[in-house]
Amino acid sequence: MKKKFIALFSVLLLTSSLFLSSCSLPGLGGSSKDTIRIGAMATTESQIVSNILKELIEHDTGLKVEIVNNLGSTIVQHQAMLNGDVDITATRYTGTDLVGPLGEEAIKDPEKALAAVKKGFEERFHQTWFDSYGFANTYVFMVRQDTAKKYNLNTVSDMRKVENELTAGVDNSWMEREGDGYKAFSKAYDIEFKKIFPMQIGLIYTALKNNQMDVALGYSTDGRIPTYNLKLLKDDKKFFPPYDASALATDEILKKHPELKTTINKLKGKISTEEMQKLNYEADGKLKEPSIVAQEFLQKNNYFEGKN
């Protein structure tokens, strides 16, 4: 399976390389050499974090920063950095990059996974992987508070004793995923739900809230989790690999502007999963622009009190 994945990743990487070489994505190719270019995916989370970095770097260093938007995947982000089209990518995830660009096996221990990507990206790509912001965006099982109380559910293992009574809503793709999909999960936890409802991930949270199922599998930083007062069940067997979020920068840009390292490190451990949920909801639920959400986060946490 690992060989198949690496082969597939290589094909996708070549395709994205040819694409990026033949045409410019929005924001690519027209920047001044004195401008710091931050790559961001189209997700709300990536948009918010990239704006946090932009505002903080401009405030602390006086450097001009632009965001290169809508880099559609880890593969595209990776190739954009290799091509020199961006200097920093705002949201990189340990589990994704470990098995993607590095082509390694998944590592379940978060600290070991972080150490592996730091070492791998420095040695192979001359890029610096920063410490985690403090949040991980991973798969997580969740239930309503009434369900948790009724069945005394705190961990994923707790579901085993009532598996025949629980219906579950899950992401369509999760049913077929190798390694961390339903078959592997069922084997690891010895759990088979009464009934499973595969559906689009965006529909799961509301369906759970509206009592259409008892359990749902979603993403840990989704803003609807606190809004709907859902309870997250601890992955006590550490089945899902860690997806801790960090910034990634080229060694070249850090050598040219060493002050960037100090500024980026200010965010180490400063954005918890709960905080990221709230920030995502500010944008998705309250329809605020990610740039506004970023500014409000920095102001609230007094990041603008230092250099100017």
From Swiss-Prot:
Induction: The complex is induced by either hyperosmotic stress or by low temperature. Osmotic induction is sigma B-dependent.
PROSITE patterns assigned to the protein according to its UniProt record, in alphabetical order: PROKAR_LIPOPROTEIN
A Pfam short name: OpuAC
GO CC, any one term: ATP-binding cassette (ABC) transporter complex
Keyword Iron-sulfur: no
Record lipid sites (S-diacylglycerol cysteine): C23
Covalently lipidated residues, kind N-palmitoyl cysteine: C23
Residues of the signal peptide: 1-22
Topology with respect to the bilayer: Lipid-anchor
InterPro entries hit by this protein: ABC_Gly_betaine_transp_sub-bd (IPR007210)
Places the protein is found: Cell membrane
Coiled-coil segments on the chain, per record: none
Membrane spanning stretches: none
Predominant place of localization: membrane
Any GO molecular function: transmembrane transporter activity
Keywords: Cell membrane, Lipoprotein, Membrane, Palmitate, Signal, Stress response, Transport
Complex formation: The complex is composed of two ATP-binding proteins (OpuCA), two transmembrane proteins (OpuCB and OpuCD) and a solute-binding protein (OpuCC).
Function: Part of the ABC transporter complex OpuCABCD involved in carnitine uptake. Involved, with BetL and GbuABC, in osmoprotection and cryoprotection of Listeria. Can also mediate weak glycine betaine transport.
Family: Belongs to the OsmX family.
The protein, known as: Carnitine transport binding protein OpuCC
Gene expressing this chain: opuCC
